Structure formats: C-alpha cells, structure tokens
Amino acid sequence: MASILSVESNTCTRCGSCAAACPMAFIRIGAKGPRTVPAAQEACMLCGHCVAACPAGALSHSRLAEHFAPLDEAWRGDVHGVEQMIKGRRSIRKYQQRQVDRSVLTAVLEAARYAPTAMNTQPVKWLVVYEAAEVRKLAAATIDWMRAVVAEGKLVAGKYDPSPLVMAWDGGVDLILRACPHVIIAYGRQDNPMAAGACIAALTTAELAAIPHGLGTCWAGFLHMAAMLHPPAREAIGLDDGCVMHGALMIGYPAEQ
C-alpha cells in the first residue's frame, strides 16, 4: 500500500524528525526515507506535524495542502508581548455603534480555527450574526426566556434574579448583548462529545485574535443559557438540525479603551 507521504529523496536526510513528531507513530524510516504504515491510510489525524518537523522541507502529505502557511519565527522570542496581550484582555461591555468589516471578522475566525481540537477532528462550526437588527432579536429572545423565569418565581442558574435585566430592557437598555454590533457563535454536532471543548478553545483563541484588530469581546453567557433552556431562543439562532451552541462572543470596537 502506498505511503501517504511524498519524499524528495535528494533533500531528505533520513534524520527521523518526522517519525519522532508523529503522535500516532505511523512513520518508519527506511533506506529510501520515511514511509507510513498501512494503518495511516485510515487513522492519520492530518495534524501535519511530520511535514512541519522536517528540517529539510523534504516531505509533503497527500491529504494536506501543498504549502503550509509560513510562520515568522520572531514571535517566539516576544515573551513580553504575548504576556501583555493575554494580561490586557478585557471583557468589553460598551461598543461603538459601527460595523466591523466582514474581512476583519473573517481574519479573526481564520486565526481561531488554529485552536486545538481533540485528535485534530476540527468539529467547530461558526455562525456570525452580523446585522445589528439580528443581534437585537437574539437579545429579545433571551429576555423572553428571562420573563418566563421571573413569572415562574425562579432564578437563573439557581442564583440570579433576572428581573433587573428585564426592567433594564424595558427601559431601553440592553444588558444582554450590550448593544454590540455583532455576535460570533461557536457550535458543533450534538452527537460529537469533543465539540464543546473545541468550541470553548476556539472562542478563547478568537478573543485574543481580535485584540490586534482593535476589537473587544465579551462572552455572551445569557444568550448561551437561553439557547440551552428556551426552545424559542434556539429557534431564533437558527442552527442546523442536530447541532448545539457551545458558546458565543459579543464583538465590536470598544467605546472606551
């Protein structure tokens, strides 16, 4: 059975870096260079470690893009810059009333898709609620759920009285989605037990990826709870059948720095 790796024999030094990097131990080094074992045909997780680890750039993988996106190695030495970005992250609850260009949101999600997923299954799906009117509909659906909670004399998550949030909404103040211009929702297949963790990791990565673009974010926890507990809210979000929301971010330009 053919190997799923292609090797440039004139470049390969048979150093074994690719075999050492393979998390599934699917690569063997022979006289003609590395080859994959038969099990790799079905079980390779397509992580790309083998190609990335080759110091000579001699490997290509039949199921991966021919060229990997190059990395600027300078970032590895900027420990202070990375730490400052992580420490400087804030939950933003006041936004400028202007849209973010779609290309910028796409760039944020493009970075977020590199967040880790179990076995490289990449189960995260995205829904971007772009128009402000649609964002307000989701906030309204969440308020409807809270009205029902108040009417039943219950508390949100067994702790919080939602009536002040409902009163604020009725007074024209949105404390649910903070009048943000956009919402990013991460969701996955309901039958995939790894989707929840992957979505949370991806949203966390999106938070950081948004910072260099001058964007602020905040987790939309009330919307998430409504989506889990209130069928009309789930319907308002409009996910594909068999899918479940695992988290959401408000996103936009901060009104204050």
Regions found by a protein language model. Give the residues of each.
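Glycine/small-residue-rich phosphate/adenosyl-binding loop
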Residues: 127-199
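A glycine-rich helix N-cap at a beta->alpha junction
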Residues: 147-155, 159, 234-257
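Ferredoxin-type iron-sulfur electron-transfer modules and their immediate structural context
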Residues: 1-21, 25-28, 86
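Small-aliphatic-rich amphipathic alpha-helix that forms the alpha element of a beta-alpha
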Residues: 13, 108, 112, 182-184, ...
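Short loop-to-beta-strand entry elements in the cores of soluble alpha/beta enzymes
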Residues: 121-130, 222
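Specificity-determining recognition surfaces
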Residues: 20, 71-106, 246-257
